[in-house]
Amino acid sequence: MRVKTARKRSTSSVRWLQRQLNDPYVAAAKREGYRSRAAYKLIEMNEKYGFLKGARRVVDLGAAPGGWTQVVAELCPGARIVGIDLLEVAPIPGADIITMDFMAPEAEERLIAMLDGQADVVLSDMAATTTGHRQTDHLRTMALVETALDFAIKVLAPDGSFVAKVLRGGTENEILTVMKRHFRTVRHVKPPASRPDSTEMYVIAQGFKG
């Protein structure tokens, strides 16, 4: 579908709109009731690696707008699902989501109290607000991943899993090295729903050693 350029609409916004209109995952999300196309990234990764199977406690870091949380609620009925995001997330049945900056000092304590036990899975689709400078964006997002990993190491039950978004840029191998010390299996994957022109990838760490 082609999009006509409005006089005051930027070329980049036209490209974004055209991409959205032509994206089968956007159409599928609208049709199936998911809040974002990102839901399919989690679905695809879980279908291949099964990290949500049997999960009873799951944490979703960077939950807005709620696509990943929706998937977890569907695949893990009855599980304790807690999420956090700086942006407010509309209620999702079966999940408790707090509006708070995950990087805030009190966030970790709040999440641990809400979990009321060790987590089976910690998910992080967090990414820093983009600046337009690729290396800066990479470093800022990797700082979020490092904090998410530190949290996961504290709350995961033995044999638990950690799944996080990373941006390619040179330093992601360092965090993979750290993960390999704590998990039996660590993979670097790009699900089909991740746009080919995006630098994002996901790390899937399974078999937490405790």
Q: Model segments located where?
A:
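Class I SAM-dependent methyltransferase Rossmann-like catalytic core
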Residues: 1-56
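Glycine-rich helix-loop-beta junction characteristic of Rossmann-like nucleotide cofactor-binding loops
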Residues: 47-53, 115-116, 154-155
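Conserved class I S-adenosyl-L-methionine
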Residues: 54-64
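Conserved SAM-binding loop of SAM-dependent methyltransferases across substrates and taxa
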Residues: 65-77
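Short glycine-dipeptide loop
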Residues: 77-79, 156-161
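S-adenosyl-L-methionine
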Residues: 86-131
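A short glycine-rich, Lys/Arg-flanked "PGG" loop and its adjoining helix->strand segment in the class I
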Residues: 142-158
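Class I S-adenosyl-L-methionine
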Residues: 168-210
